[in-house]
């Protein structure tokens, strides 16, 4: 019975770890999308003036 318990804990840990890694990739993709959107904004003078912190 203890062996079954250990297998369940191990399986849960592996699934959780791989889910976290997949989610990190999604977060990185979202950061890239936000960066591209901000860069697009910075090329337009009205948007640039409204967002000086992002456009530097």
From Swiss-Prot:
It is found in: Secreted. Residues 17-39 form a propeptide. Expressed by the venom duct. The modification Cysteine amide is found at residue 55. It comes from the Eukaryota. The keyword Disulfide bond applies. Its main location: secreted. The keyword Coiled coil does not apply. Residues 43-45 are annotated as: Ser-Xaa-Pro motif, crucial for potent interaction with nAChR. Residues 1-16 form the signal peptide. Keywords: Acetylcholine receptor inhibiting toxin, Amidation, Disulfide bond, G-protein coupled receptor impairing toxin, Ion channel impairing toxin, Neurotoxin, Postsynaptic neurotoxin, Secreted, Signal, Toxin. One of its GO terms (molecular function) is acetylcholine receptor inhibitor activity. Disulfide bonds join 41-47, 42-55. The cysteine framework is I (CC-C-C). Alpha4/7 pattern. Alpha-conotoxins act on postsynaptic membranes, they bind to the nicotinic acetylcholine receptors (nAChR) and thus inhibit them. This toxin inhibits human alpha-7/CHRNA7 and alpha-9-alpha-10/CHRNA9/CHRNA10 AChR (complete inhibition at 3 uM of toxin). In addition, this toxin inhibits high voltage-activated (HVA) calcium channel currents in rat DRG neurons (22% inhibition at 1 uM toxin) probably by activating GABA(B) receptors (GABBR1 and/or GABBR2). Belongs to the conotoxin A superfamily. This is Alpha-conotoxin Pn1.2.
């Amino acid at each position: 019975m203890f062996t079954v318990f250990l297998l369940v804990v191990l399986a849960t840990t592996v699934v959780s770890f791989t889910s976290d890694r997949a989610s990190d990739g999604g977060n990185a993709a979202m950061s890239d999308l936000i960066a591209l959107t901000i860069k697009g904004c910075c090329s337009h003078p009205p948007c640039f003036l409204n967002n000086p912190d992002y456009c530097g």
